Amino acid sequence: MFFGERFFTTAMAKVSNKANKIIKKEAVFKRLSENRYAKFQYEILETIEAGIELLGTEVKSIRNGSVNLRDGYCSFRDGEILLLNVHISPHKNVGPFFNHDPLRNRKLLLHKKEIVKLKYNTEKKGLTIIPLSIYLKGSWIKLTIGIGKGKKLHDKRQADKQRDIKREIKTALKR
């Protein structure tokens, strides 16, 4: 084995190790909580992935799955988007002094262009921003928010009918 061959094999080993680490990080995707109620109440037109500004005890609670997105919504303050009314339970193994407020307002981390677009959609078009799901992406906790239009009662009934028809078609095709 000559010098160049040895150098080439070690370089390839380093590249493959880096590639394996990248593949392992991308493979981790774990849904922690989902807002199924939002899909029933709103017609979701577009979804956006956002980061959340969290405290340490909130991260622990979310990883345990003790988060409720059902009543949550987003609002604008001082050019920022805040996540309001999302309940993250206090962590069990921490004393009350170090724990967080379960319903505190949390800042969403988005690019300025996305914030401007969302603000335009909510103010001009009368749409609502709703949290849809919260999940782990690698080691980061991410939130999927949706731009939605509220459904009326007849829209909900029509969606139920369409769902029933699809279900009947699937059962008929299985036979």
Swiss-Prot record:
GO terms for cellular component: cytosol. It comes from the Bacteria. This is SsrA-binding protein. InterPro entries: SmpB (IPR023620), SsrA-bd_prot (IPR000037), SsrA-bd_prot_CS (IPR020081). Required for rescue of stalled ribosomes mediated by trans-translation. Binds to transfer-messenger RNA (tmRNA), required for stable association of tmRNA with ribosomes. tmRNA and SmpB together mimic tRNA shape, replacing the anticodon stem-loop with SmpB. tmRNA is encoded by the ssrA gene; the 2 termini fold to resemble tRNA(Ala) and it encodes a 'tag peptide', a short internal open reading frame. During trans-translation Ala-aminoacylated tmRNA acts like a tRNA, entering the A-site of stalled ribosomes, displacing the stalled mRNA. The keyword RNA-binding applies. Keywords: Cytoplasm, RNA-binding. Belongs to the SmpB family. It is found in: Cytoplasm. GO terms for biological process: trans-translation. Gene3D superfamilies: 2.40.280.10. HAMAP family: SmpB. Its main location: cytoplasm. GO terms for molecular function: RNA binding.
